[in-house]
A protein has these predicted regions:
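Active-site/ligand-binding-proximal alpha/beta "capping" segment
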Residues: 161-196, 200-201, 210-214
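RNA substrate-binding interface of SAM-dependent RNA methyltransferases
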Residues: 68-163
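Structured adenosyl-cofactor binding patch, chiefly the S-adenosyl-L-methionine
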Residues: 199-240
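Mobile, glycine- and charge-enriched loop segments
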Residues: 36, 60, 66-78, 185
Length: 240
């Protein structure tokens, strides 16, 4: 069923306008009576097309319910900035797996080092990828790709979360299963770029409250690590 997102909705007068209306009328060529879903803040509004007039699609509400695909935990991925193609892949797959937001972080070992102005130009495309992935995977929200922040700024954000884990390749960290996520509502996941984190960065995260987690003896690529970690996290929090 076609899926569309909106930030606000009037249940008595649900309609689509702009590019979404054009997509319904011209790309999908939908007719009166055909079903589609409008998502607003994690709620699915299942509707039927009533009529299409100009650049507006008028809808009749059939039922509404909480989106079953939305996790019960709020997960923020703090991803050290990799090369753009890898970041696009990470955004798409992270959204499919249930992340709430993605915060690109500039760390010492980042190979790609865009300045804030250059990165801002890429944000439009990254958020478009997030929207496409949200539609494809049946999400109830479009996860945000936030502006790039410094590592210091990321650590300040971590303090506001219930639990944060840092993936670190050196032995000595806990496994995910040893961390404990019972009753936790907000989780941070901190993952390095191609070069990982240096010891000072890892220690700074631990001092901020992050738990150092080790994924095993195999070294994962930076685009594989978030997929692995998010899959484990969703399983452990009963969100698979």
């Amino acid at each position: 069923m076609p899926r569309f997102f909106t930030n606000e909705i009037d249940e008595e007068n649900i309609c689509l306008t702009g590019p979404d209306a054009h997509h319904v009328g011209f790309s999908l060529r939908m007719k009166a009576g055909e079903p589609l879903t409008v998502c607003c803040n994690g709620i699915d509004y299942n509707c039927n097309v009533r009529s299409i007039t100009g650049d507006t699609v008028y809808l009749d509400l059939v039922e509404k319910h909480r989106c079953a695909a939305e996790p019960t935990v709020d997960v923020t991925l703090f991803q050290a900035v990799p090369k753009l193609d890898k970041l696009e892949f990470i955004v798409r797959k992270s959204v499919e797996l249930g992340v709430t937001r993605i915060v690109p972080v500039l760390t010492r070992r980042c190979v790609s080092r865009p300045d804030s102005k250059d990165f801002a130009k890429k944000l439009v495309r990254l958020n478009k990828i997030a929207e496409e992935a949200a539609k494809q995977s049946g999400r109830g929200i479009v996860p945000e790709v936030a502006p790039m922040v410094s590592y210091k700024e990321a650590l300040a954000m971590i303090k506001e979360l219930d639990r944060t884990v840092l993936l670190y390749e050196e032995e000595g960290g806990r496994s995910f299963g040893d961390v404990g996520f019972e009753g936790v509502k907000s989780i941070g996941l901190v993952i390095g770029s191609e070069g990982g984190f240096d010891k000072e960065e890892a220690q700074a995260a631990v001092e901020t409250g992050a738990v150092q987690v080790w994924l095993g003896k195999r070294i994962l690529r930076c685009e594989t690590a978030p997929i692995t970690a998010l899959s484990i996290l969703m399983f452990l929090t009963n969100n698979m």
